[in-house]
Amino acid sequence: LIVDIAKKQNPAVVFVTSKKKFQPARGNLPQQRKPFRQPSPFGQPGPFGSPSPSPQQPGPGNGTGTGFLIDKDGYILTNNHVVDNADVIKITLDNEKEYEAELIGSDSKTDIALLKIMRQPGDNTNFPYLELGDSKKVEVGEWVVAIGNPFGLDHTVTTGVVSAKARNIGAGPYDEYIQTDASINPGNSGGPLLDMEGKVIGINTAIYSRTGGNVGIGFTIPINMASDILDELKKDGKVTRGWLG
């Protein structure tokens, strides 16, 4: 079953590379004291707290991560921290074909970004894509599959189970992470977590680790959270929320 899922869904998972003209210098907080208050182990500022402010340093900076196609027209979901402040975003498909991508919309509060592949004139490719599932139906203990690009090793497939639901890790007001022991590492960020039907149930986002490597505790944004804001990201490029005042 897992072999079938990997063969069928791998072509819809993409390698995301972001290039920045300026890369912020970031300091690391002591990992032993505050393992949740360190820069994200995925190599970009992630949901485990904000690094200490520091001036911009001249010079190029590159970020890498994962994304996945959600329709035949080339829309891609990934993490906001993978492409945040990027000047150029490049997508590499399973067949090694490269495209530039446009940032359609992003939401830092949920760490979700929507990209779209920029086609050349006359390119009518129907891209392979993943079907979005229902994360409300996810059960603790069910098997899951993660696909991503850990350490640049593209289209790596790992398996595990759902370890917990609605996990709060102190990242913000939208903490409802799915916890999994499927192996995810730097470069997996933005990739899909799939159920045994091959449907996306979450976006792999972060890990708990004192070393920066996988220890079997990964966190995934429930896909329903992305589905809820998808239309708004397409239309407005951002999410507008109400407030009391």
Please name every model-derived segment.
Residues 1-245:
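Serine-dependent protease modules
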